[in-house]
């Protein structure tokens, strides 16, 4: 019964793979919870930082920090956040599609794009795609720190100050819930105008000697905090997407095993029926 043996081998192989995907699902679920906690802890800081920057900027209207200066767009920069590893569904692909679409739109206007890639998948994809990757940082691990991002982010900030790029955007995945992660594009530079009502009625600070040195010191930290928030949120998205992908793979493996088991039972039944028929035929011929 060669066919039956082959099916048994297939079932054994798929069961082994199913154990691996099931284990990966549980690991991803555990990492996702930790990543969610980190994401929720950093969100208030990033939001408060945005409000503080907006308030300080409005308190000194005579001074325009370089990060707030609008100019004609001739070249743009993107910081794109991706994962270092795969097996996380379409998470990276969706973010890459968003950036590629925006790159094409800029290209139609005669505007080129510089890319800072955070994550191995993004760096590899855009280098192969032909994008101008001017900075990259990979292998951040499951607990990334802001210090790991400073070097690559500074490359883009310096490019903006020096006039090499005229706008800077961040592309990352937003954690909606465990089942849904959505890619988004956020303008970092020049700093978008804040909501007057949101900013104007919360504080009444006195700055001594003035707000300019405070703004100069906080601006780079603000951009770094926004990028770090994007990285932390993308990590939570990655683990959620991986958990869902591995659960789907485990469930699919179970369905395939059931189908193969049915095929094996049919093959075994056919073999037994054939043996009985041969025995009956042999007995009849002897009789």
Swiss-Prot record:
GO CC annotation, single: plasma membrane
Membrane-related topology note: Peripheral membrane protein
Localization: Cell inner membrane
Chief localisation class: membrane
SUPFAM superfamilies: ATP synthase (F1-ATPase), gamma subunit
Pfam family, one: ATP-synt
Keywords: ATP synthesis, Cell inner membrane, Cell membrane, CF(1), Hydrogen ion transport, Ion transport, Membrane, Transport
BP terms from Gene Ontology: proton motive force-driven plasma membrane ATP synthesis
Subunit note: F-type ATPases have 2 components, CF(1) - the catalytic core - and CF(0) - the membrane proton channel. CF(1) has five subunits: alpha(3), beta(3), gamma(1), delta(1), epsilon(1). CF(0) has three main subunits: a, b and c.
Similarity annotation: Belongs to the ATPase gamma chain family.
Record NCBIfam families: ATPsyn_F1gamma, PRK05621.1-1
Protein name (record): ATP synthase gamma chain
């Amino acid at each position: 019964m060669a066919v039956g043996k082959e099916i048994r081998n297939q079932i054994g192989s798929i069961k082994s793979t199913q154990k691996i995907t099931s284990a990966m699902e549980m690991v991803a679920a555990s990492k996702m919870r930790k990543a969610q906690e980190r994401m929720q802890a950093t969100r208030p800081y990033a939001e408060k930082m945005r409000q503080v920057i907006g308030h300080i900027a409005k308190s000194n209207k005579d001074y325009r920090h370089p990060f707030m200066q609008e100019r004609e767009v001739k070249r743009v920069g993107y910081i794109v956040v991706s994962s270092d590893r795969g097996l996380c569904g379409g998470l990276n692909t969706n973010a890459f599609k968003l950036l590629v679409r925006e790159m094409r739109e800029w290209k139609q206007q005669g505007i080129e794009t510089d890319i800072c890639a955070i994550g191995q998948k993004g760096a590899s994809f855009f280098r192969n795609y032909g994008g101008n990757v001017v900075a990259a940082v990979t292998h951040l691990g499951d607990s990334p720190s802001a210090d790991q991002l400073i070097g690559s982010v500074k490359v883009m900030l310096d490019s903006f100050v020096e006039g090499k790029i005229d706008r800077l955007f961040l592309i990352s995945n937003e954690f909606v819930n465990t089942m849904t992660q959505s890619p988004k594009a956020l303008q970092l530079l020049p700093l978008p105008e804040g909501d007057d009502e949101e900013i104007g009625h919360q504080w009444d600070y006195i700055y001594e000697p003035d707000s300019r040195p405070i703004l100069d010191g906080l601006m780079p930290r603000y951009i770094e905090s926004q990028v770090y928030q994007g990285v932390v949120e993308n990590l939570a998205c990655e683990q959620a997407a991986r958990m869902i992908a591995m659960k789907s793979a485990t469930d699919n493996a179970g369905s395939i095993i059931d189908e193969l088991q049915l095929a094996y039972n049919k093959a075994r039944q056919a073999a037994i029926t054939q043996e009985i028929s041969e025995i009956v035929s042999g007995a009849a011929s002897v009789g």
